[in-house]
Each structure stands twice: as C-alpha cells, then as structure tokens.
Amino acid sequence: MESPVVLDKPPEYHGDRGFPFEEEEGSGAWSELAARHPDIAARLRQRPATWARKRRPSSNDATDDFGDNFSGFDRFPFDDIPPEFREHFPSHWNRRFSSRDEQPQQQTPASPTQPQQQTTATQTEQTPTHSEHEQQTQIPQYGLRNTVDLGQKSPADPSLVDADDRTHRSMSAPPDTPNQTKMSVHNHQEQTHQPHGETQSNVRHIPIFVEGRDKPVINKSVDHGTHFGEAKPQYVPPPPPPHVDRDQYFADDVNFHPPPNFSRSFGTPFNKTYRQGPQPFVQQKAYPQTAFARGASPQRSQSPKPTDEHFVKVPVHHETPKAEPPSRAQKSPQQHQPPPPKSPQQHQPPPPKSPQQQPPPQREQTPPQPKTQQPSSNDPITQILSIQTDVLNLMTDVENFTGTKKDKRYLFLDEMLTRNLIKLDNIETDGKENIRQARKEAIKCIQKCIAVLEAKADSSNQQRKAQPEQETQVQDECQSHDVDMKENTQNDQTTEIPAQPIVENGEVEMDEATKEKPAEPQTAAAVPPQTDNTEEANVEKQAVESAVAVEKDEKQEVVKVEAQEKSEEVKPEDANASGTVNPAETQPPAADTRPEDNKSTGGDAEKKEDKKSTPKKVTKTVKKRDKSKDKKDAPKDSNKEDKIEANSVLNPEPMPVDEKGDKTDSQVMDVDGAASQ
C-alpha cells in the first residue's frame, strides 16, 4: 500500500552537500543578493515569513512554490547565509529554524513531494532486499533502502517531463533530493539501533502512513547504521497527527508526476490496487513506468553515477519476499560497480532496481503460460478421443434400437449424439491438420449414427403402421366368415324345422323322417365343414332331434297300449250285445289288421331299435322324461279304468286326453281305432 511520507527533518548540508538547486537558488543566490544588493536583501529578509504565513494553509493544495519549499524544508543552510542576514532574521524564522524537530513536517511543500511520491514506493519496497545485501556484501553504500539511481530513468516517465532542468543540476550535485528528505524520518527512528558508519550520509527513513494504523510502517530489518552518524538522533520527532491528512491527500497523487490535478484524477484507481498488497507490479505493466523500467536496467550497468532525475515512481509494497531472491541475484553485481566514497550516490541505485523487480514477476508469469498451452495443445486430441468412445458406445445402442421416434430411447440417443457434435464444434484445431482430420472423422461417425438411428425409427414406424392394416384385414375376414357361419346355421335350422311336423304326421311319415334324419346330418356336416363351430352345432342339433324323436315314439307307444286296452274292453261288450256275430265280425278285421299291425309293429320295433340305438347318447333326458310321463300316465289309466267300470263309451274320451298332449297322438288314435274296428 502506497502512502506519502512526510519528512521530519531535512539534513543540514555543509560545503558541497546540499540540494541540487540550493547551490544556484539557495545559498549561492542569497549570498549574491546580499553582496550585490544589500537594500534588496533587507527587503528579502521579510519575504519568507510572509510566504510561510500565506502558503501554509494552501500547502495542502499542492500549489506551493519554491519559496514555501525552502521555508518548509528548511533548505537554507545557515552556514551558507552570511551572518549579517542571520542577525536580521524575523523572530518566527528563528523559532522555525530552532524547532526543526516540531514543524518541518507541517510545512512540507507539495511540488517537491509530488516527485517524491513517485520514488517512495519502490524505495520502501526494496528496503528488505538492500538491507540483506548490506549484510551479505558488506558494501554499506549500496545496501541503503532509499538509494536511487536516477540516471536510469527514460524520458518516457511522466515524472521527468516537468523536471528536465533538475536532471541537469543533479548531474553535478549530490542527490540530496526529496528522496533523501523523505527517507530521513524513517532512518532517524532506527539510528539508535544501527552501527556507526559514514557520518556524512544523507540517507533518511521514510515513515509510511497506512490507513487504519496510527504509526507509520517502518521496515525494521533494514540496517542503515553504517551510513549514518550518531550526531543526528535529535531529529527523530514523533509524527504529528495532522500528517495523516496530508498522507491521505498524497495517497491519491502517488503514481503520477507533479501536476496535482492529473495525479488526483488518475491516481485513485491505482491507490486502491496498491492498498491490496503485491498487486501493483502486475497492474502497472501497461503504463510507461514499465517501459522506462525495462530501458533502465541496461543503463544501470552503464552509468551507475547519479546523473538523472531524482524523482522516481515507487509503488509501496509491504510484502516483497517473493520478488527479493531474483532481485538479489540481479543487483548484487551492480551494487559493486559504483565506488564506495560516493556516499551521496547511495540514494540512487534502488529505482532501477525497482524496475528490475518488476520483470521477475513477469518472468514468473510467462513460464506458466507455455505450461497451460501444452495441455491445451493436448486437450483437443484427448477430447476427440473421449467423444469417439462415447459415440462408439452409443453406436451399439443405435444398432439395438427397435423403437420409433416417439420412444424415450430414441430421444436419448439423438440428444447424446447431438451433444457430442456440439463438443466437436467447440474444439479448436489451432491450425493443426491432425486435429482437423480427427474432428472430421468424429463428426462423420456421429452423423452416420444419427442417420442409422433415424432410418431404424422410420422403418419401425412403417412396420407398426403395416401391422394394424393387416390386423384390420384379418378382422374383416374373420367377421365375414362369422356372418357366413351364422347364415349357414340359420339356413340349417330352417331346413330342419319343417322336418319335425312331417315326423309327427303318422307312423308311415315317421319312417320317412327316420330315413331322412341320417341323411340330413350328413348334408349339414358336408355343407359347413369350414369351422368346428358348425360341426358342434350339428352334433347338438342331432342330439336334440333324437331326443324329440324318442319322446314321440314313447308317446305313440303309450297311446297304442291304451287303444288296445280300450279295444279289448269294447269287444266283450259288443259280443254280449250282438252275440257270436260280433266276434266273427271283429276277428276278420282283426286278422286283416294284425298283419298290418304286425307290419306296423315290426316297423315300429325297427324304429324303436334304431331310435334306441341313436338316443343312447341322451339317456339322462329320456329317463327323466320317462319318469314324468309315467307319472302322467298313471292317473290317466286310473281314470280310464273308472270309466270302463261305469260302462261308458270310452272312444271319445281319449281324444280330449290326447288333445291336452299332442295332436299327432289323436291322429294316431284315429288310425288305430279304424284299424281295430
């Protein structure tokens, strides 16, 4: 996280040491003015006080000029000012210069700090690496965390556009720039714990104010004691709270060159990224800082001297252990190049090292890219192989498929095949012929599978449509056959029904009926031989007809027996009435009728034998009916005997009895009576 740093106390410079512009604008300018124009010098003695009063409230607006800068940073070394001017300094000047530990931070100008803001990030970020190099290489000049080699900066850096004249001055003067002043506070806080080194060092610590913290962030691992003397522990005042506001103000301006409006408008998005930690290096690659960083690394090896701008963009980085090892390896040879006596140059090496730290993460990021490309180059082939295996598995299902397009199985297979097609479409060939050929073959295979599946579904649909047609045809044929069968059975019934009255019309007709009966079933059996139903119907009909015939024969026999009994009873009565003539008269007709009776009885016997042979199948019905008829006959016989005892004429009596039964019996009775008479 990057935040501006307010310096507690700028160093006092004696002789050659001082800010690059102090020689011209600072001590040299005052001395010349005092020598040439003493009256103007007296007038100028009061100007800094007025400037300080006027400019202090506006210093927060980053619009302070050099007048306020000199008063705020106390950049006028008293050694360079003639003593006559010191005597005439205003009282508030004396207070300000005497209490350097208290107020210099409140008077920090904006114009020099803006370029400083660009240097702080890399300086603070690289401190652990340089401190470790101090301990390893034991070259204290180059292990400073705040050393900045400003000769490495390219004109592409926006911070250099406004400071061309300063770069020329820095070529000749030691780098006692705001970089050094900002670093002062941070180093002063650690001077007590550090060993003695060069007392003339200009290195200063930079207290970095982080949001959410009350104290500035200080890298305690940095050992800068070799570069500082013990004569300056008094310059370590605690940072006053108003600096937090100024830090927050500068936090928006950290990334860009001095113009405050430009820094405010474009600095905020980068400050957000800096506050997140090690991200600034990755996110600043698109900006000219990286361009000058890459161009700066070769210049670092060529010109280790502080010949360029002192203001460098430095993204503050609190977590830099990952970037340290490559930076150490790269910077260790470079740190040995500049000679040790150049203590002021100790501030300048780090900025080119900050760009050198930026390429290592890039190098770390570039090797994973070919790693990702290698599996990606293998991915298309593996994907095509997996798709082909799936298609082969689906092909077996397609071959076994027998349903229609409405079946779920068909929908499933079609969906899976189309998904595999889509997968093949998403595969990139990357201009490789083998991948193209494999994809084409896989697509052709899937298309064939889909065609086979559709063909099978269509064929099964046609088969299912054909089957209902065949079934309807068969049903129609069966229905026509059934109609024919019904008609045949009805015709058979109509032909058989008139045969029954013929059988009922006398004994002679009974013979004809019996002779016709065996023929009729034969014809009936011959006419409808098509199905078994007709045969069964014929068998049933034959059984019913035989049963009816047996009943009729039994009735006829019973009637004949009754007629014979009546005739026998009538004959003695006639004999008693007519004498002998009646028996004689009765005998011849009896003799005449006997042969007929015998014939008829013989025919009846044959009929009975034939009928008994046929109705053996229906013995149950015959027995039941015989029993019932015997019961009916028993009262008839008893009534007839009663009537005979009463000597009544019995001939008309059996007629009504027979009328209750069948008409055929009455006719038979008449015939028998005529024959008996």
UniProtKB/Swiss-Prot annotation:
GO terms for molecular function: adenyl-nucleotide exchange factor activity; Hsp70 protein binding. Induction: By cold. Expressed at high levels in chilled diapause eggs and to a lesser extent in chilled non-diapause eggs. Residues 380-457 form the BAG domain. Residues 614-626 have a biased composition (Basic residues). It comes from the Eukaryota. Residues 9-20, 187-196, 218-230, 306-322, 550-574, 593-613, 627-645 have a biased composition (Basic and acidic residues). Residues 104-129 have a biased composition (Low complexity). Keywords: Chaperone, Developmental protein, Stress response. InterPro entries: BAG_chaperone_regulator (IPR039773), BAG_dom_sf (IPR036533), BAG_domain (IPR003103). Residues 336-370 have a biased composition (Pro residues). Residues 1-203, 218-380, 459-479, 509-677 are annotated as: Disordered. May play a role in transmitting a signal which both protects non-diapause eggs from cold injury and terminates diapause in diapause eggs. 'Samui' means 'cold' in Japanese. PANTHER family: BCL2-ASSOCIATED ATHANOGENE, STARVIN, ISOFORM E. Binds to HSP70. This is BAG domain-containing protein Samui. It comes from Bombyx mori.
